[in-house]
């Protein structure tokens, strides 16, 4: 119970009241920014629906660098033609060769080298901004750090599965957001983060090149430090990721990107696991007390259960408002009960090597 209170009141509880403006400025004004987007398919939905939202951002000086990996000449020509209407778009093509697969890190590396500006933001083609202020808020973060971390939630859909996916995304993002807010950053989010070219080339580019993942966590852990990180938390700076399936798709996605977790520093793994472990032990102790202990212990267990849930619900509501999430708290009790089982399932799946992770 004490560990749970510590996490929700003193760690997660710092997110709603966090103010990046308390950090000293390293730039006197917001810099020009390059937004780098790797594109691994002929995604016309991105071109027609999402790209217009990005180029329409309220920011005076930016470019969008699209790195297309493929062999469709017509699609690439369409990207080039779009530049006539939107001059801030830069399209780069990497010819797809099945004998030499292109990883996301390779595509991002080409995008970084093609970018004209020092300050870089990264996102993916399946996410869209919640407002026309996303870019300006993220770029403003560079005034106080060479690394900018933002949040990306899941698109709201119908059904309980969509609710679980959205809440899982929010609460698991809370781990790295709260750690960054508390002065111990260790990763970003591949849909919404940025850094400078100086940091990238100073680290000799991406690490773990034998993996198809890790650009937002394993590499970031090399360049990240408490003094160079700016965390941008605002509903207007939140991105939304499209959902491509139900729980089976989501668990498969978590298994894929979870392949980087074994390479995290020990303190990060302990930080993540202590909350989950203490929650499981608390539930088990409460169930045992309610089932077999004398009535005095049953009353005490019931009071502690209600007190914990009230605290968790209040903090979850405050966090969801800060991150721009809606309709989270009404069914949070069910997520609180079910998420340990999903975490256990994911842990078992991670014991088996995922061939998609490795090159």
Residue spans of the language-model regions?
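N-terminal membrane-anchoring/stem segments of glycan-assembly enzymes
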Residues: 1-26, 316-319
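Membrane-embedded multi-pass helical conduit in multi-pass membrane proteins
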Residues: 279-354
């Amino acid at each position: 119970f004490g560990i749970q209170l510590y996490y929700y009141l003193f760690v997660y509880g710092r997110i709603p009241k966090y103010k990046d403006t308390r950090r000293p400025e390293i730039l006197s004004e917001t810099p020009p920014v390059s937004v780098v987007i790797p594109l691994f398919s002929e995604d016309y939905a991105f071109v027609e629906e999402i790209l217009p939202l990005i180029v329409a951002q309220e920011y005076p000086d930016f470019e969008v660098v699209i790195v297309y990996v493929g062999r469709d000449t017509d699609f690439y020509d369409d990207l080039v033609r779009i530049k006539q209407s939107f001059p801030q778009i830069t399209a780069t093509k990497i010819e797809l060769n099945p004998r030499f697969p292109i990883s996301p890190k390779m595509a991002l590396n080409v995008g970084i080298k093609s970018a004209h500006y020092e300050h870089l933001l990264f996102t993916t083609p399946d996410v869209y901004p919640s407002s026309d202020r996303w870019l300006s808020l993220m770029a403003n973060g560079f005034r106080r750090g060479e690394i900018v971390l933002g949040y990306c939630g899941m698109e709201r859909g119908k059904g309980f599965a969509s609710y679980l996916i959205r809440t899982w995304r929010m609460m698991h993002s809370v781990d790295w957001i709260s750690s960054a807010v508390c002065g111990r950053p260790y990763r970003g989010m591949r849909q919404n983060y940025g850094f400078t070219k100086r940091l990238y080339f100073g680290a000799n580019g991406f690490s773990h090149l034998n993996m198809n993942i890790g650009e937002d966590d394993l590499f970031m852990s090399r360049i990240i430090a408490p003094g160079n990180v700016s965390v941008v938390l605002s509903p207007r700076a939140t991105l939304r990721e499209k959902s491509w399936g139900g729980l089976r798709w989501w668990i498969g996605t978590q298994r894929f990107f979870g392949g980087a977790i074994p390479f995290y520093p020990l303190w990060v793994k302990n930080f993540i696991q202590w909350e989950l472990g203490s929650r499981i032990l608390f539930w088990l102790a409460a169930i045992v007390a309610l089932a077999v202990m004398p009535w005095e212990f049953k009353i005490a267990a019931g009071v502690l259960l209600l007190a914990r849930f009230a605290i968790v619900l209040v903090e979850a509501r405050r966090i969801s408002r800060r991150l721009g999430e809606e309709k989270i708290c009404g069914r949070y009790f069910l997520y609180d009960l079910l998420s340990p089982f999903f975490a256990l399932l994911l842990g078992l799946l991670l014991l088996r090597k995922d061939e998609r992770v490795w090159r």
